[in-house]
């Protein structure tokens, strides 16, 4: 029997190795911002998520930029689908990975459109390196409390083998509800999300690579190990 996996990210995903049910823990709400705050030209535009691409797309025509950097293979794939040329994508799919491998020069003007709750590591690190950074809050994330309760009920009836978390926002939404401590079913897609879960007092497994495919591989490996296969 395939492992039953509850996936909590906002976009759907399927994998033949497991039985997936999507239970998004957060929803995104568009925010208003004054587009007059945008400069006419940037050296770099940075997208750190698929949502950033989706919410900023209507504003692309208002600016000119020389090059585009993205975080994550899924973000790049969405850009490719929308005919947006990507110039740089780090091999480590995280803000830290982008900073450590970044091609920006001191004095470059960089625009980062993202969520209101986005981590500030990248913008702060770039500023400290002498790069001019503008951060725009395009949207915010809010918990979906009915989804949190649905997962808690499923856990109570032992009808799940794994629960996955693809963002710190989703982790906060769920673990702040004080779910049971079950070290065998919580899985994180990346080190930053895993760190958030651990800071909230819980343990989890972490995907080897920051992709959904890698996380499913980790789930299957752990399921076979636990079953003694």
Task: Describe every region a protein language model picked out.
Residues 1-229:
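Signature of uroporphyrinogen-III synthase
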